[in-house]
Each structure stands twice: as C-alpha cells, then as structure tokens.
Amino acid sequence: MHKLGGFLAGFAVAGLMAGALPVAAQEIPNEGPVETRTVLSVEAKQPVPLDPKQIKVEVNGRQTALTSLTRIQPATAQVAILIDDGLRSSFGIQIDDLKKFITSLPVGTQVFVGYMRNGGVTGAQGFSADHASVAKSVRIPLSAPGISASPYFCLSDFVKRWPSNSGGARFVLMLTNGVDPYNGSTSLMNQTSPYVEAAQRDAQRAGVSVSAIAYADAGVRGGSASFSGQSYLQQVADATGGRSYYNGTFNPVSLSPYLDEFRSAIAESYAATFMASALRGKGNTLTRLKISTSQKGLKVHAPEAVHPGSGAE
C-alpha cells in the first residue's frame, strides 16, 4: 500500500499535472473564446441516442453552439472508486458486489481502487485495465471513525493529483457517509461548507465526474449528520455532472443496483465540445455551464461549471 502522492515520484510535478489535466492545469489564452470539451451523461428508462440538434448549451448564461458530440467509449474511460476507510466493518458484505462490478467493466476500462484516509487517497496500484488484479485490492475498511479527515479533502487531493496522464473520460465513485467534520455543526442551518465547494471546483477544473453512494461510517452518526452528508454528496454530484445513487436512513442492503446504474451512466456518456471564453487575467477560472436537451424522456447530467479550454486537444 502506498500514498497516492507516491505516484509522483521521479516526475516533475508540473510536467505530470500538465499531462494528467490536458489544459486545466496549463496556461490558456486569457481572453476570447477557446475550444472546450466536457463529459455529460444521459439518464433514460431505455437507452436512446442523444440527438445533438436538441441540445442547448449555455456558457455564462449565453447560448453557445454545440460544435461536436461524441459518445464516450467505455473502454477508453478511467474509473476511480474511492472508499472511506472509516466505513463500518459491515461494509465487508458489499465487497463481492464491488468486485463483480469491477470485473464486469468493458475490456480496456482503466480502474483504480483507493481508500480515503488522513485527507488523501491510498491505493495498492495505479489505474489498470487488469480488472481481476484491481478487484483483488478491494478490502474491508479499517473502520476507524473519522479516519478520512474529510472525504472532500481526499477528493480534492485525488483529482488534483490524478494518477494517470491518459486523456480518457474521468469518473469517480465515492463510497462514504459524506459528512464534513471540519464544517462544524451538521444542522440544517449549516449546510454551506467551503471544503465541499473547494472539492467540487477542483473536480470541475480536472474534468472529473463525481458520483456517490452514501454509506455510514463507524462513528455514531445519524439524523441531521446523515442528512448533511448525503446533501453534500448530492451537491458535488450535481456540480460535476455525476449522480448520487443512494440517500436513505440505513445503509443499502446491496450495492449491486447502484453499481449497475453507475455502469449505465458511464456507457451513456458523451463528450460535448463548444466554445467558452476565459476571463482576462484569470487562467484558472471556472465558467458557468448549463447543458440541457429537449429530447423527450431524456435527462442530461453535466457539470455546472467548466474550465475554458479544458479537454481540448
């Protein structure tokens, strides 16, 4: 086992980040429109091809032309499964479902399994298309309450240090209770966390779609804490074009149906290209984005903000 940061050994940090985040971590023109690409997914009862003629793209509140729409090939995608090391030991009954999910992914899909603790992510290996090997790295969490420090610290650290320079679409699935212990009270009156917002912005800059399945940790939490954590997970998912698959009082009996939904979301993902303007003098800024469709029976999940120039080759 080794810390994610270990993947950076032997590389110049700036060089690796430029490869991992094609444009988000690089300087781009600070004025005028630049080609920008983002990943979106389609939710429908039955798989239906997305009609580009019925898509509406708005950048900073202004309608912008969609220049291309290409279906993501799952075999080129990267899927990171981040497990909170503070989850209850009863999570062990879910391990078989998680292993089956990993081995069922399309040939070529690169998978990473990491454990969130102490504000970072620890994994046995980097991204790999050897699904059987990755599945073997899934283990029972340490079940130490609060060991992740904050799942949002872990998410921020991971997406900023994405351990691959591949240009494929990037997906994260978080398994955590979602509680941010550093934001004070979990009451309904205290649901604005700077750490959650920072994590979602980091994911948006890195072009990462973040989904989640809420699962209780080993600490004695419930009531407002459960609501708070699940609300934060939904917030991050909505902001990055992902989905929050389970919100409930008790832990899910099985992860299988939610993992199936996550697999379907990856299979029904597209790369959308359009022009977006970067703000003068702010090379690392985010621009408001809204993508919708008038196609009946379909719902589009897309990030709420994008880094102008991100994803462009």
For the regions a language model picked out, list residue spans one by one.
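Positively charged n-region of N-terminal signal peptides that target proteins for export
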Residues: M1-G6
